[in-house]
């Protein structure tokens, strides 16, 4: 035994990469860490340069003080020994190579190549850092050389503490940035999370409820756009469901009647069954053919409506004069007892050829249906401005009451008087759909206001442009209007351009 059940929809595939929240948080951490590192290097470099510059200034000041006091010349040994009570090391080298030194406990003033060059008189002054000391050597005017150094251990201790402070403060800054970035990202991406949950909800349950909108930023606009999409999807589903329901209702009546007639025909042809009179058989067969024609028309209308709802149209330049001519020929084959007064211009619409043809055909069919035998139907296509033309289809029928003029464009709507005539109630609905899809407008007015009958005129505003008029050989400026009554039979057609012009 086979059991059928509804297939559950596959869940949305989870991505293996980092979430947007984590990516934003990591980006914030990286940026803050980069800024902290750059600032730490800058602070360290500035403070280090300042401390070492201060040491150089201290050594320079101490040397100038010794030189200016004159003690080096009067009693160099005592002068140098006096420096032992300060925080520097000193050495005086006289021209006779007598050396006086005073050094801090545990320290030795280093003498290198730079200092020896000063002693030999090759350099006037030198500065260098060596063996944790900063050394200054100066050549005096009497030929002596003064060497002074200071330990860098206190400075290095300060710099070491500064490094730890910068490391700790930078780490705290990165951590705070990570926490703050996570909080801001979580709050900022909350609308995105709601959108994701709504999309997953729609995929799982077909629930099209809108999402609450908070604020007026970009994410709020994204939420509003998503809500618009949900509303459009809900309207599309509602139209689809209504179309299926209405189509089922409209198809049921002709199908039931057709089935009854076919069963009656089959029963009358069964062996031993009573035969129907010949005229009844003829009427029954004609009724079956009429019902089949009605079903074909209804199915065609439904296909056109669903095609327009789905947006399955190919847009191309369309010559409306040619559309009117072709539609007129089709209507005349069904109603050759109607006189058509047609006045058209060469107008080009960028749109769907099949849809525009069906729109024009339905308007003329509707006007012919409500016109008495021998009546007149007017079809006029005229230019209103540089980018708009107006198609008007008029009849002399009973007219449409004002309260029903909006309803006649609804699907399957049929007034009480229209139910006695053939039709599915979809013709003007298709007209409305095609016109709106092409950016046009519709309105209904009486052909003869106050007249009996008033008639009906349907006005269609179509955007487009005037078609260029090619000059034919031998044509004169006045030959702009051609009466093609003979080519139309009973149709009286007056065209602004000649028939041959529109056919090109």
Curated annotation (Swiss-Prot):
The modification Phosphohistidine is found at residue 249. It is a multi-pass membrane protein. Gene3D superfamilies: 1.10.287.130, 6.10.340.10, Histidine kinase-like ATPase, C-terminal domain. Deletion experiments show that amino acids 95-133 are required for activation of MprA. Pfam families: HAMP, HATPase_c, HisKA. Autophosphorylated. Residues 487-504 have a biased composition (Polar residues). It comes from Mycobacterium tuberculosis (strain ATCC 25618 / H37Rv). Residues 471-504 are annotated as: Disordered. GO terms for molecular function: ATP binding; phosphoprotein phosphatase activity; phosphorelay sensor kinase activity. One of its GO terms (biological process) is phosphorelay signal transduction system. Member of the two-component regulatory system MprB/MprA which contributes to maintaining a balance among several systems involved in stress resistance and is required for establishment and maintenance of persistent infection in the host. In response to environmental signals MprB acts both as a membrane-associated protein kinase that undergoes autophosphorylation and subsequently transfers the phosphate to MprA, and as a protein phosphatase that dephosphorylates phospho-MprA. Keywords: ATP-binding, Cell membrane, Hydrolase, Kinase, Magnesium, Manganese, Membrane, Nucleotide-binding, Phosphoprotein, Protein phosphatase, Stress response, Transferase, Transmembrane, Transmembrane helix, Two-component regulatory system, Virulence. Its cofactor is Mg(2+); Mn(2+). InterPro entries: 2C_sensor_his_kinase (IPR050980), HAMP_dom (IPR003660), HATPase_C_sf (IPR036890), His_kinase_dom (IPR005467), HisK_dim/P_dom (IPR003661), HisK_dim/P_sf (IPR036097), Sig_transdc_His_kin-like_C (IPR004358). Induction: Induced by MprA. Differentially up-regulated under different stress conditions, such as low concentrations of detergents and alkaline pH. Induced by low concentrations of sodium dodecyl sulfate (SDS) in a SigE-dependent manner. In strain ATCC 25618 / H37Rv, repressed during growth in macrophages. Highly up-regulated during the early stages of invasion of the human blood-brain barrier. Changing residue 249 to Q: Abolishes autophosphorylation as well as dephosphorylation of phospho-MprA. Residues 1-26, 185-504 are cytoplasmic. One of its GO terms (cellular component) is extracellular region. Residues 48-163 are extracellular. This is Signal transduction histidine-protein kinase/phosphatase MprB. The chain crosses the membrane at residues 27-47, 164-184. It is found in: Cell membrane. It catalyses: ATP + protein L-histidine = ADP + protein N-phospho-L-histidine. Residues 246-466 form the Histidine kinase domain.
């Amino acid at each position: 035994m086979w059991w059928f059940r509804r297939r559950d929809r596959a869940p949305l595939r989870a991505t293996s990469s980092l979430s947007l929240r984590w990516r934003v948080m990591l980006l914030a951490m990286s940026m803050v860490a980069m800024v902290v590192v750059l600032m730490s290097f800058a602070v360290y470099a500035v403070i280090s340069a300042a401390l070492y510059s201060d040491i150089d200034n201290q050594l320079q000041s101490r040397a100038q003080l010794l030189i200016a006091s004159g003690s080096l010349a009067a009693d160099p040994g005592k002068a140098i020994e006096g420096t032992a009570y300060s925080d520097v090391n000193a050495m005086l080298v006289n021209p006779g190579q007598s050396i006086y030194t005073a050094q801090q406990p545990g320290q030795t003033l280093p003498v290198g190549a730079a200092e020896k060059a000063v002693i030999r008189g090759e350099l006037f002054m030198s500065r260098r850092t060596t063996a944790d000391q900063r050394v200054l050597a100066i050549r005096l005017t009497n030929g002596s050389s003064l060497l002074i150094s200071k330990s860098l251990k206190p400075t290095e201790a300060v710099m070491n503490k500064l490094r730890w402070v910068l490391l700790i403060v930078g780490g705290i800054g990165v951590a705070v940035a990570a926490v703050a970035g996570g909080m801001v990202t979580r709050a900022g991406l909350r609308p995105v999370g709601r959108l994701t949950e709504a999309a997953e909800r729609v995929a799982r349950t077909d629930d099209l409820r809108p999402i609450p909108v908070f604020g007026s930023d970009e994410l709020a606009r994204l939420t509003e756009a998503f809500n618009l999409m949900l509303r459009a999807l809900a309207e599309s589903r509602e139209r689809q469901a209504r179309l299926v329901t209405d189509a089922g209702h409209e198809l049921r009546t002709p199908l039931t009647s057709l089935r009854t007639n076919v069963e009656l025909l089959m029963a009358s042809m069964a062996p031993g069954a009573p035969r129907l009179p010949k005229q009844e058989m003829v009427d029954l067969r004609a009724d079956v053919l009429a019902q089949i024609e009605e079903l074909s028309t209804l199915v065609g209308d439904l296909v056109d409506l669903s095609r327009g709802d789905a947006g399955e149209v190919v847009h191309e330049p369309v010559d409306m004069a040619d559309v009117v001519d072709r539609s007129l020929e089709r209507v005349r084959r069904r109603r050759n007892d109607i006189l058509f007064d047609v006045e058209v211009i060469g107008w080009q619409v960028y749109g769907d050829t099949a849809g525009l043809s069906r729109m024009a055909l339905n308007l003329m069919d509707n006007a012919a249906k409500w016109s008495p035998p021998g009546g007149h139907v007017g079809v006029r296509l005229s230019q209103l401005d540089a980018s708009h033309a107006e198609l008007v289809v008029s009849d002399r029928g009973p007219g449409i009451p004002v309260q029903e003029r909006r309803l006649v464009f609804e699907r399957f709507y049929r007034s009480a008087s229209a139910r006695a005539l053939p039709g599915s109630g979809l013709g003007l609905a298709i007209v409305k759909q095609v016109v709106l899809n092409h950016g046009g407008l519709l309105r209904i007015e009486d052909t003869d206001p106050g007249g009996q009958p008033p008639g009906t005129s349907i006005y269609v505003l179509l955007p487009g442009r005037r078609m260029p008029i090619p000059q034919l050989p031998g044509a004169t400026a006045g030959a702009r209007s051609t009466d093609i009554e003979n080519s139309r039979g009973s149709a009286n057609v007056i065209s602004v351009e000649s028939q041959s012009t529109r056919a090109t």
